[in-house]
Swiss-Prot record:
Function: Catalyzes the synthesis of GMP from XMP.
PROSITE patterns: GATASE_TYPE_1, GMPS_ATP_PPASE
Record pathway: Purine metabolism; GMP biosynthesis; GMP from XMP (L-Gln route): step 1/1
Residues in GMPS ATP-PPase domain copies: 208-400
Gene name as annotated: guaA
Keywords, sorted A to Z: ATP-binding, Glutamine amidotransferase, GMP biosynthesis, Ligase, Nucleotide-binding, Purine biosynthesis
Organism taxonomic ancestry: Bacteria, Pseudomonadati, Pseudomonadota, Gammaproteobacteria, Alteromonadales
Chain ranges of the Glutamine amidotransferase type-1 domain: 8-207
Pfam family, one: NAD_synthase
Residues noted as binding ATP in the record, renumbered to the chain: 235-241
Gene Ontology molecular function, alphabetical: ATP binding; GMP synthase activity
Gene3D superfamilies reported in the protein's UniProt record: 3.30.300.10, 3.40.50.880, HUPs
Name recorded for this polypeptide: GMP synthase [glutamine-hydrolyzing]
Length: 525
């Protein structure tokens, strides 16, 4: 079995919104990497023993007092270094170059850089040719400051009209700096540049791929738990489903999955989870039908935060009860993924991401005397999905839209009642079914229906009815931090509205939410 961690890249984070994207791109190439705070010690870097180091971007100005700097050891470790945006600027400044503050000359968005010299980083890469016969590259810029003088031993490799050092290189030391962002898709051949760095320049093998990650995870699970039994809270979501499949492959019947049906799931979701994991894959599943228990606990409660806390508390109570029945279980499995492990603004300076100990299951009892098994701890969400496909999980389950942890508990506004949940489930299923039929489901980032606790008058035949209102919500987003409402076709919305009003007895009106984020959030509660 190939060692998936044998070759690795270390990414030092200075606070850029794009830093996780760099890590995902390096992983995509097939190379393992980790994302650390910029203020790490020499001892930590030595212990990690990377084949190369990337200095990522950041919002600070290198010219400001006390702005972040790369550890000096980075430039003495004898490995290639790539500085991106702020990373290039701090590299330049620390090695004897100069950086000046941008005064109205920053570059933001699309830019074309002109190559001045050949470099190992850009070998064979060009998007166009200049009138002077030089290669041009389409890139994405996002900087105010710029390098005004490069350090000794470096050469200018690329420029723009306003940035004389858009890229620089010291080929002998294998130090490279780019003022643009190769990790974003707008930099047309950015992935090739990162591949040149990680594979050709750093000499990394490309062992980081789904099949190898699965093999490695299974071996590690076996080594960790031995012959012990393991318990897992299976929700039917992506992370817990992939953990279940990995553990099943590793330890078979020694895994017990606890599936708690809280009555707040999507239409037929409980049946689908039980059929797929129990009947089809043969996992050992304990099914707890707790709908009444959850609804009783939320009776009379309208505040969204209070509802979330109740749902979390009742889940923990039930999971604790069920885990005590599995007296031989020595390990608790969780679907913690790599972004859970990266926490903002907690380094020594408060200006970078740091690694933290993270427990993914909301508030599990502190007195649970079990070891923790987290087989997805090193993986990004897109990697988890690819592994799920490799393990045989269906595409439409792995790539469906996000669903909140409290489920319909935060999509029924105000007090949650069984009647409201049943109406919402059916209306939402129609909306999602029609999105699939119209080939629109994968064109929006998230779509769902919200139950509004208001009655509206409607006309059915010769009679009038006074029934409930639902709102359809669909958004387009890259990172879920900001979002635009999706401009779905009017005839499509009309079709969905007609079906819901005609097929779901109890709903008299359908509205469409046209709020962006900000100012609105994606979920209503």
């Amino acid at each position: 079995m190939s060692n998936i961690h044998e070759h690795k890249i270390l990414i030092l984070d200075f606070g850029s919104q794009y830093t996780q994207l760099i890590a995902r791109r390096i992983r995509e190439i097939g190379v393992y990497c980790e994302l650390w705070a910029w203020d790490v010690s020499e001892a930590q870097i030595r212990e990690f023993n990377p084949q190369g180091i990337i200095l990522a971007g950041g919002p600070e100005s290198v010219t400001a007092e006390n702005s972040p700097r790369a550890p000096e050891y980075v430039f003495n470790a004898g490995v290639p270094v790539l500085g991106i945006c702020y990373g290039m600027q701090t590299m330049s400044e620390q090695l004897g170059g100069k950086v000046i503050q941008g005064v109205g000359e920053g570059e933001f968005g699309y830019a074309q850089v002109e190559m001045l010299l050949e470099s190992a980083l850009f070998k064979g890469i060009e998007d166009a040719i200049s009138p002077a016969g030089r290669p041009l590259l389409d890139v994405w810029m996002s900087h105010g400051d710029k390098v005004s003088a490069i350090p000794e031993g470096f050469k200018a490799v690329a420029k723009t009209d306003t940035c004389p050092f858009a890229a620089m290189a010291n080929e002998e030391k294998r130090f490279y700096g780019v003022q643009f962002h190769p990790e974003v898709t707008h930099t047309r051949q950015g992935l090739r540049m990162l591949e040149h760095f990680a594979v050709a320049i750093c000499g990394c093998g490309t062992n980081w791929k789904p099949s190898s990650i699965i093999e490695d995870a299974i071996e590690r699970i076996k080594a960790q738990v031995g012959d012990d039994e393991v318990i897992l809270g299976l929700s039917g979501g992506v992370d817990s489903s992939v953990v279940a499949m990995l553990l099943h492959r590793a330890i078979g019947k020694k895994l017990t999955c606890v599936f708690v049906d809280n009555g707040l799931l999507r239409l037929n979701e409980a049946e689908q989870v039980l059929e797929m994991f129990g009947d089809h894959f043969g996992l050992n599943i304990v099914h707890v039908d707790a709908e009444n228990r959850f609804l009783d606990a939320m009776a009379g409660v309208a505040d969204p935060e209070a509802k979330r806390k109740i749902i979390g508390r009742v889940f923990v109570e039930i999971f604790d009860e069920e885990s005590k029945k599995c007296a031989n279980a020595k390990w608790l499995a969780q679907g913690t993924i790599y972004p859970d492990v990266i926490e903002s603004a907690g380094s020594a300076t408060g200006k970078a991401h740091v690694i933290k100990s993270h427990h993914n299951v909301g508030g599990l009892p502190d007195d649970m005397e079990m070891g923790l098994v987290e087989p997805l701890r090193e993986l990004f969400k897109d990697e988890v999905r690819k592994i799920g496909l490799e393990l045989g999980l269906p595409y439409n389950m792995l790539y469906r839209h996000p669903f909140p942890g409290p489920g319909l508990g935060v999509r029924v506004l105000g007090e949650v009642k069984k009647e409201y949940c049943d109406l919402l489930r059916r209306a939402d299923a129609i909306f999602i079914e029609e999105l699939h039929k119209a080939d629109l489901y994968n064109k929006v980032s998230q779509a769902f229906t919200v139950f509004l606790p208001v009655r509206s008058v409607g006309v059915m035949g010769d009679g009038r009815k006074y029934d409930w209102v639902v709102s359809l919500r669909a958004v387009e987003t890259i990172d879920f931090m900001t979002a635009h409402w999706a401009h779905l076709p009017y005839d499509f919305l009309g079709r969905v509205s007609n079906r819901i009003i005609n097929e779901v007895d109890g709903i008299s009106r359908v509205v469409y939410d046209i709020s962006g984020k900000p100012p609105a959030t994606i979920e209503w509660e």
